[in-house]
Amino acid sequence: MQDVDIYKALANHRRLAILSWLKDPKAHFPPQADGNLVEDGVCGLFIAEKLDISQATLSEHMRVLVQAGLVTPKKIKQWIFYKRDEARIQSLKDGLISGL
């Protein structure tokens, strides 16, 4: 993915909120029956509820974030869990700083 596509992924208030919440999932989401908030990520259902959007709309936002390499999905049972790709995000930060 080109840098401009990554910046487009970040140019949405909902996706920025998702990334912010996923940085500290225990502070923003309730405990889950399946999956550890920190190790496995947050169930998409909880993210959709917090944003007050449909699961279909959330799926599109998460598709953009996954394609940008900012989050990683993990399937547990019938649920998809998402967490930040901290190494990729740090690499983007470093690239932005050195590129300016």
At which residue positions do the language-model features occur?
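Alpha-helical residues within the helix-turn-helix
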Residues: 49, 60, 66-67
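Short, Lys/Arg-rich amphipathic alpha-helical interaction segments
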Residues: 89-100
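N-terminal helix-turn-helix DNA-binding core of bacterial DNA-binding proteins
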Residues: 8, 14-54, 80-87
